[in-house]
Regions:
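The feature marks the mature, well-folded catalytic cores of soluble enzymes
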Residues: 2-168
Length: 168
């Protein structure tokens, strides 16, 4: 996902014009600096909300639906470098959230609160998903309701399995 984001940024910058990136494209200051020297401008969500008629790269972490809606309203062209694995996960969560059934369920995401990917996942549920960072937090879930558990793509499988076992 990260390699794709960098390649897309390089391609766009080679074509000339201004390219913004919503958040640091990677967690590597040297690479961020190199792309900045090529012309990439890193912005935050506040900057993005006030941007109009621009081209913005979305990094591998993914974004909530609200970001795409703002882009549409503000005539922002999106260069989407969201990792395909993250996109599939977002789609699964959104389907589960929007599926109308009689079951009273809660969507739970094992991940780091505030992490860009997790914000994108929670956004699929209009902010209703519950985020847990460790097994202890799973103990606070409402076990009278059905639980649908998902994980941030970069989290430990071992810890995820412990949470699954606890919930069972």
């Amino acid at each position: 996902g990260v390699v794709t984001a960098i390649n897309k940024a390089e391609e766009e910058l080679a074509n000339g014009g201004t390219l913004y990136c919503l958040g640091d494209i990677v967690h590597n200051s040297r690479e961020v600096e190199r792309l900045k020297e090529m012309g990439l401008i890193t912005i935050n969500h506040d900057d993005f909300n006030h941007l109009h008629d621009a081209k913005v790269l979305l990094r591998a972490h993914g974004e909530p639906p609200e970001t795409y809606e703002i882009a549409r309203r503000n005539n922002i062209e999106i260069i989407d470098a969201t990792c395909p694995v993250v996109l599939r996960l977002q789609k699964k969560i959104k389907q589960e959230y929007t599926q109308k059934d009689t079951e009273d369920k809660q969507i739970v995401i094992y991940g780091k609160t505030g992490h860009a990917e997790v914000l994108g996942l929670v956004g699929q549920t209009t902010g209703e998903a519950i985020v847990i960072e460790k097994l202890e937090e799973a103990k606070k879930l409402d076990f009278t309701r059905s639980i649908r558990l998902y994980s941030q793509t970069t989290k430990s499988l071992d810890e995820f399995q412990k949470i699954v076992e606890y919930i069972k």
